[in-house]
């Protein structure tokens, strides 16, 4: 029985599945949008959203560190929490530049948003094997939408 089993296996062993998730997430964070199969997009969406949530927390800690004075005794605890969250994100990608981009550029856009950082748009079927393709993209923030209008 599959009670409470959430993750899709995508017909791959654990190590290959993890590498696939990390690769798709990396491309999504670097480019903002990717085209992949619907099954892969649905599988990577929770992974990406959890990373953005951690990055949001790190961004909030960084903001609070900048607002407080250097003499504040709680500032060291905030710094350690910020570093711990960044290291947790870095564990998946092993790329400090990407972690910096996620925490300082991407997560800041979603500070006021409670989840739903990505969207999946179905685009049709692939020609070779008729696999259903989807676009997985980061949701734009309201400030970006207002600039376009």
From Swiss-Prot:
Name the UniProt key words of this record, in alphabetical order.
Ribonucleoprotein, Ribosomal protein
A Pfam short name = Ribosomal_L17
Q: Name one GO cellular component term.
A: cytosolic large ribosomal subunit
Q: Has UniProt tagged this entry with the keyword Secreted?
A: no
- According to the UniProt entry, the coiled-coil residues are none
Describe, as the record does, how this protein assembles with itself and its partners.
Part of the 50S ribosomal subunit. Contacts protein L32.
- Name it: Large ribosomal subunit protein bL17
- Which organism is the protein's source? Kosmotoga olearia (strain ATCC BAA-1733 / DSM 21960 / TBF 19.5.1)
């Amino acid at each position: 029985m599959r009670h409470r089993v959430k993750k899709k296996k995508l017909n791959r062993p654990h190590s290959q599945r993890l590498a696939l998730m990390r690769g798709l997430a990396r491309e999504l964070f670097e480019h903002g949008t990717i085209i992949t199969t619907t099954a892969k997009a649905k599988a990577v969406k929770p992974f990406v959203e959890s990373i953005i949530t951690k990055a949001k927390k790190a961004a909030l800690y960084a903001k609070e560190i900048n607002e407080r004075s250097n003499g504040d005794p709680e500032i060291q605890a905030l710094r350690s929490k910020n570093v711990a969250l960044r290291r947790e994100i870095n564990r998946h990608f092993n790329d400090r530049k990407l972690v910096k981009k996620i925490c300082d550029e991407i997560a800041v856009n979603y500070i006021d948003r409670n989840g739903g950082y990505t969207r999946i748009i179905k685009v049709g079927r692939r020609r070779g094997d008729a696999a259903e393709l989807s676009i997985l993209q980061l949701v734009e923030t309201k400030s970006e939408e207002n600039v376009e209008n």
